[in-house]
């Protein structure tokens, strides 16, 4: 009998309001399971970014409960938040690169903060910049990079430390279709080879169709539309994404 997988994230009747305004998120109940690939969709203003803010611990809900990695996020002391955030990789819409650091040093930041040996940092960052076609821009400061280049640096930084949960807000919005597909394949490699749970917010229907075994979470006016059992219970069959598959190369080697 297959052991029921643990839960990465569990929302229980979560609501969120800003100030005295009406709720921007209402009655959200769902579970994210290890090693799954999720797309978050919905019209502009549906609440996608607000939901992502809850996921990457930038916001606490107005009501309801959230558990992450087995801990209650509502009662978690703020002093413990940094340790939890180290388990996350986040791609923001506005990139949030460190202005005075080069592209290389921005990507290296999570590894250095984790205390990785500099030789390993150099190898990992060089490989990652090569994957996102930015080796030639390694020494460039963010202000000299195009929007698409900044986005690729932000994505490389988010995945470099092999997070347990990757959260990406419109990660392909500033790149051409060829690079968008390549970045999606990078997320899939992280998902397949490392076992990272991936949540991608996007309007791009074609992008969603390229990950056939993904699960779709659709928001409408702050509520989860058409919720399925897959968002509440683990899949009946293993998705083929093993959290123990860390021996495989990441990022994957380039094909000739």
Enumerate the predicted regions with their spans.
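Helix-to-loop junction immediately C-terminal to a conserved catalytic motif
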Residues: 56
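Conserved ABC transporter NBD signature motif
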Residues: 64-72
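ABC ATPase NBD coupling module
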Residues: 73-89
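Short coil-to-helix segment of the ABC ATPase nucleotide-binding domain corresponding to the Q-loop/switch region
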Residues: 101-109
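Conserved ABC ATPase signature
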Residues: 141-145, 149
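Conserved catalytic motifs of ABC-family nucleotide-binding domains
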Residues: 162
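Catalytic Walker B motif of ABC-type/P-loop ATPase nucleotide-binding domains
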Residues: 166-169
